[in-house]
């Protein structure tokens, strides 16, 4: 499956005379590029509101992981299957993209 980002990498590799098989050996980066920022911006009134929304949810996810050892279940864990060593912010952005959270701005 080809993505615009991967196509741009291959075109840049061709322009520089680099073997395209080496350029395509790297995985497409995750995080802010997946899900795409343009799709995330439709879930909030501004990019600043999106940052606050994602940061609050990432903090909840981080607190959830920290409380597991104590046996306290005050916070809700990830609503999507987290990848190996995936950061709480990346998990939060995927939850926002999947419309798995209810959010009222200003709270």
Swiss-Prot record:
The gene is rpoZ. Pfam families: RNA_pol_Rpb6. Its EC number is 2.7.7.6. One of its GO terms (cellular component) is DNA-directed RNA polymerase complex. HAMAP family: RNApol_bact_RpoZ. Keywords: DNA-directed RNA polymerase, Nucleotidyltransferase, Transcription, Transferase. Belongs to the RNA polymerase subunit omega family. Promotes RNA polymerase assembly. Latches the N- and C-terminal regions of the beta' subunit thereby facilitating its interaction with the beta and alpha subunits. One of its GO terms (biological process) is DNA-templated transcription. The RNAP catalytic core consists of 2 alpha, 1 beta, 1 beta' and 1 omega subunit. When a sigma factor is associated with the core the holoenzyme is formed, which can initiate transcription. It catalyses: RNA(n) + a ribonucleoside 5'-triphosphate = RNA(n+1) + diphosphate. One of its GO terms (molecular function) is DNA-directed RNA polymerase activity. This is DNA-directed RNA polymerase subunit omega. InterPro entries: DNA-dir_RNA_pol_omega, Pol_omega/Rpo6/RPB6, RPB6/omega-like_sf. It comes from the Bacteria.
């Amino acid at each position: 499956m080809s993505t615009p980002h991967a196509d741009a990498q291959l075109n840049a590799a061709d322009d520089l005379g680099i073997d395209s098989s080496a350029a395509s050996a790297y995985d497409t980066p995750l995080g802010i590029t997946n899900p795409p920022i343009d799709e995330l911006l439709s879930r909030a009134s501004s990019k600043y509101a999106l940052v606050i929304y994602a940061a609050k949810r990432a903090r909840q996810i981080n607190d959830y992981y920290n409380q597991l050892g104590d046996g306290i279940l005050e916070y809700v864990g990830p609503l999507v299957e987290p990848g190996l060593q995936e950061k709480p912010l990346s998990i939060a952005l995927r939850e926002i993209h999947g419309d798995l959270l209810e959010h009222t701005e200003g709270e």
